[in-house]
Amino acid sequence: MAPAKKGGEKKKGRSAINEVVTREYTINIHKRIHGIGFKKRAPRALKEIRKFAVKEMRTPDVRIDTRLNKAVWAKGIRNVPYRIRVRLSRKRNEDEDSPNKLYTLVTYVPVTNYKGLQTVNVDEN
């Protein structure tokens, strides 16, 4: 049996969810829109990218860059790219009356080959 914890040993620290951070991910769109009808594929792909960003960054406010939108729609409504490389940036909301303190900006990262790419933290410059 695990040893019992004493009452006053709780870790006090800042939550990592409130940190401003930027990461690059490869999203497999193909598995997320498999079985979706032709006329709903590109719109569904954008919804899935938004859902992925909410899950990874834990902010309900997700903003998609126009270049990412153009990249998803580049081959039309039917032929969405199988994979896409995106940069998710969790940022502070400048708007004071907004209910969310943070938002996520999703930008497109053009790559020629997806082989061997992993999720990486990007330094804020």
UniProtKB/Swiss-Prot annotation:
The keyword Repressor does not apply. GO terms for biological process: cytoplasmic translation. It holds the Pfam family Ribosomal_L31e. One of its GO terms (molecular function) is structural constituent of ribosome. Keywords: Cytoplasm, Ribonucleoprotein, Ribosomal protein. The keyword Cytoplasm applies. Component of the large ribosomal subunit. This is Large ribosomal subunit protein eL31.
